[in-house]
C-alpha cells in the first residue's frame, strides 16, 4: 500500500542514502587516485564487471561498478541497468560511478565501450542482477507552460493539449464517478478532469471567487462556496447532478465564505464566514442555518474538512498558520468548540514537530489517507496537506506530529522539478490535494506552476 512509508522510516532512509552517497564519492575518489596507471581503455584486454554496490535501490540510486578496463572517457562508456540507459558520472579504469535510471526492473547491468563513431567495440555484463525497487516520485500529470515557464493557455482539451490551470486551489472526486475529478480555480473557471475520456473541460464560470467543493450526503448534488463581501448575497450554491452540475441555485446567504463541508455520516452542512471567524450549521431538512462558534481569529481565511469517520473536523486557518480540531457531538449532531492540534497563532515558518512546536506557512487543502500501520487504532488516518508558502506537502498524524512529505528538493524552496519526493521535487505554491484510493496516488494543484502534479509509485 502507498502509505507504508512512515515518517521515521523515510527520514532514516533519506539519511542512509546520503551517507551511502558520501561513502561512494570517497571510495570513487580513492579509486581515481590509485588507478592512474590503468585508467585508459585497452582494446587488447577484456572488460570485466566483478562487483557493484549497492545491490538494491530505485531511481536515482548512486551505484559504483568495480572491475577491469572500463577506461576513463565517459563519452565512450555506455551503461544500462534493466535495459534502461544509466547516467555515467565518472570512470577510472577499475571503477565507475553511475546513477540508476527509472524502470530498471530486470536489473541486469551491462557495460559497453564505444569508439569515436559511437559503435560498440567491447562489452560485458555483471554476473549478478541489481534488485530494482519502485519508489514514490513527484511527476507532472497535466498542464503545460511556455516562455520559460511564465505563460500558459487556459483552454479545454485532451490531456496532452489542455493548456495550464488557473487557481487550482481545491480538488474533489465525484463520489459516484471516480473518473471525474473537479478542480476549483478560484477566480478562474472550475474544471472537470475526465480520466475515462482523458479530457479537461470547463464546468462553470462567472462567480467571483469559488473556494471549495463538497457534496450532499447522497452525492446527488455538488455544493460550491463563493467568497464575496455582501451578507445578503449567496455564499453557498448547489448544483444538481441532474443538470450535469450546470444549473446554479442559491443554498445559503452570507459574506466571506471560503470553506464548506458536509458531515460524512449525518449529512448536515458546515460553512464559515472568515470575516467574523464564525462557523455555521445548515440543516437540509429544516433549511435552517445556525451559528455554532467563532474561532480565536477573525478576519482570516479558514476552511473545514471532516475526518471520514465523522468524529471530528480539522479547521485549517490559512493566514494564521495553524490547524484546529473540532470534535463532533453525536447526540446534538453539531461540531464543538475547536482547539489547536498543530502550529501556533501567527507563527509562520517551516519546522517539523509535534503540536504547537510545528510550524507552517499558509496551510491549505488536506486529504485523509488510511495508514496500514495504524490498523486497530482509534484513528487510522493521516492528514496530508499543502503548505502553500513553504512549497511542500506535509503530514499531520493523529497524535499531532507534522512532518514534510514532499517538496523543497535539493535544499531549495519553490520551483518546478519532478523526481524524488525530498531530494529533487519542487512545487510553487501548492494549494489543492486529493488522494486517489483506486489509483493509489495523490494529485496536487500546483498553483503557480499552473499544473496538476502527481505523487505515486513509478509505473
Predicted ranges, named:
Residues 114, 176, 184-187, 225-229, ...:
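Short loop/turn segments immediately following the C-termini of beta-strands
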Amino acid at each position: 500500500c502507498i502509505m507504508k512509508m512512515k515518517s521515521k522510516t523515510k527520514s532514516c532512509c533519506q539519511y542512509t542514502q546520503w551517507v551511502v552517497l558520501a561513502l561512494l564519492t570517497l571510495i570513487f575518489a580513492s579509486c581515481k587516485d590509485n588507478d592512474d596507471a590503468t585508467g585508459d581503455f585497452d582494446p587488447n584486454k577484456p572488460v570485466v564487471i566483478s562487483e557493484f554496490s549497492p545491490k538494491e535501490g530505485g531511481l536515482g540510486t548512486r551505484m559504483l561498478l568495480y572491475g577491469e578496463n572500463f577506461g576513463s572517457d565517459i563519452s565512450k562508456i555506455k551503461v544500462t541497468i534493466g535495459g534502461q540507459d544509466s547516467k555515467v558520472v565518472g570512470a577510472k579504469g577499475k571503477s565507475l560511478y553511475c546513477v540508476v535510471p527509472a524502470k530498471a526492473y530486470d536489473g541486469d547491468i551491462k557495460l559497453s565501450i564505444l569508439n569515436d563513431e559511437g559503435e560498440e567495440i567491447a562489452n560485458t555484463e555483471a554476473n549478478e542482477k541489481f534488485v530494482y525497487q519502485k519508489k514514490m516520485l513527484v511527476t507532472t500529470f497535466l498542464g503545460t507552460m511556455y516562455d520559460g515557464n511564465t505563460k500558459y493557455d487556459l483552454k479545454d482539451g485532451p490531456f496532452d493539449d489542455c493548456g495550464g490551470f488557473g487557481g487550482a486551489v481545491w480538488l474533489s472526486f465525484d463520489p459516484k464517478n471516480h473518473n471525474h475529478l473537479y478542480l476549483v480555480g478560484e477566480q478562474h473557471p472550475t474544471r472537470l478532469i475526465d480520466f475515462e475520456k482523458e479530457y479537461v473541460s470547463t464546468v462553470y464560470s462567472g462567480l467571483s471567487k469559488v473556494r471549495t467543493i463538497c457534496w450532499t450526503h447522497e452525492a446527488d448534488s455538488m455544493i460550491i462556496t463563493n467568497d464575496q463581501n455582501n451578507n445578503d448575497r449567496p455564499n453557498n450554491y448547489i448544483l444538481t447532478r441532474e443538470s450535469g452540475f450546470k444549473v446554479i441555485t442559491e443554498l445559503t446567504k452570507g459574506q466571506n465564505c471560503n470553506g464548506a463541508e458536509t458531515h460524512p455520516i449525518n449529512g448536515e452542512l458546515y460553512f464559515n464566514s472568515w470575516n467574523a471567524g464564525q462557523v455555521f450549521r445548515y440543516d437540509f431538512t429544516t433549511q435552517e442555518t445556525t451559528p455554532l462558534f467563532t474561532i480565536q481569529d477573525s478576519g482570516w481565511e479558514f476552511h473545514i474538512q471532516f475526518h471520514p469517520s465523522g468524529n471530528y473536523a480539522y479547521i485549517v486557518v490559512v493566514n494564521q498558520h495553524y490547524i484546529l480540531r473540532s470534535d463532533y457531538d453525536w447526540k446534538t449532531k453539531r461540531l464543538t468548540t475547536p482547539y489547536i492540534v498543530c502550529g501556533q497563532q501567527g507563527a509562520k515558518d517551516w519546522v517539523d514537530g509535534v503540536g504547537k512546536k510545528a510550524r507552517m506557512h499558509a496551510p491549505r487543502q488536506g486529504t485523509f489517507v488510511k495508514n496500514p500501520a495504524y490498523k486497530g487504532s482509534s484513528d487510522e488516518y493521516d492528514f496530508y496537506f499543502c503548505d502553500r508558502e513553504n512549497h511542500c506537502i506535509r503530514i499531520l498524524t493523529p497524535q499531532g506530529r507534522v512532518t514534510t512529505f514532499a517538496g523543497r528538493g535539493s535544499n531549495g524552496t519553490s520551483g518546478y522539478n519532478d523526481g524524488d519526493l525530498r531530494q529533487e521535487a519542487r512545487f510553487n505554491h501548492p494549494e489543492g490535494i486529493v488522494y486517489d484510493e483506486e489509483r493509489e496516488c495523490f494529485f496536487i494543484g500546483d498553483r503557480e506552476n499552473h499544473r496538476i502534479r502527481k505523487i505515486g509509485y513509478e509505473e
